[in-house]
Amino acid sequence: MNDSRRQGENAIGRRQLLKGVAGAALVAVGLGGRRAAAEEKAAEAKPALKGRIKQAACGGVFPKGLSFEEKCKLMKELGLHGHDLLGPTEFETLKKYGLICTMVRGSAGIAKGFNRKENHEECVDKAKVAIEAAAAAGFPNVIVMSGNREGMADDVGLANCVEGLKKFAAFAEEKKVTVCMELLNSKRNHKDYMCDRTAWGAEMCKKVGSPRIKLLYDIYHMQVQEGDILATITEFIPYIGHFHTAGVPGRNEIDDSQELYYPAIMRAIADLKYDGYVAHEYGPKKDALESLKKAIAICDV
């Protein structure tokens, strides 16, 4: 075979190869384009939340075995705003996914709280550290507790809580962080806890006199303790800075397996122009992911 013929055949081979590569590239681009279009269509098809209720989650509602990063991915996918009851070690991962810590840990524990003066130094220090961390991260809330009665009269405990909270109320105002004392039932789950009635907590907030001192209204706990949920929320909404959900009885799913009708509760909260967060804090008995999706749908009014 002479050199000119060989060169001609090589040229033809190169042209065929280039055509094949170009064709494959076009196919790949086409497939990639179709895949991107399909993903975009799927994203568009996914129903957006109405947004009247800004929802978040606590750790116990997720499927077991998920890493914190996997939980963040899931929260983002489901349209949640963030996660309750975390500290600074989790903040970076939350921010990576465009999420927030909707309630930063700031208490010395449930039993040890502001109702005893001897606890004030520790409780104030912990609260101020949490407020500083929340402010630096741009997060809205910090949780505190009243503490247990241990024989103390409620009016004495209320006065002590007011005194303790006033020690950092101005600091919270300066940092634009709201400190929420949680309402818990003492009837069943937290025997002897002092901040167990909404009226008591609201009176405490009134006496502190700061827009940055409010209540964390746990719907489960207050149904167990005092009932009358809709009327109570309506009366005391100016003093409520955060909500928790769970079913009654059992503290499980908020679906129709329990006694509270959450759609009506959420509509009432939304109609009151509440602009804070509602965090799910139940313990799932059923499939955790499906229960979480359902809880979000129930509260999306």
Protein language model regions, located:
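Histidine-acidic metal/acid-base catalytic patches
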Residues: 2-56, 61, 65-76, 138-140, ...
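Anion (oxyanion) recognition and catalysis
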Residues: 76, 95, 135, 173, ...
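Active-site-proximal loop/turn and secondary-structure-junction residues that shape catalytic pockets
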Residues: 61-63, 87-89, 107-109, 148-150, ...
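Short acidic, glycine/proline-enriched helix-loop-strand junctions
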Residues: 92-104, 177
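Active-site acidic/histidine proton-transfer and metal-coordination neighborhood
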Residues: 20-31, 44-49, 113-214, 224
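Catalytic domains of carbohydrate-active enzymes, especially glycoside hydrolases
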Residues: 71-90
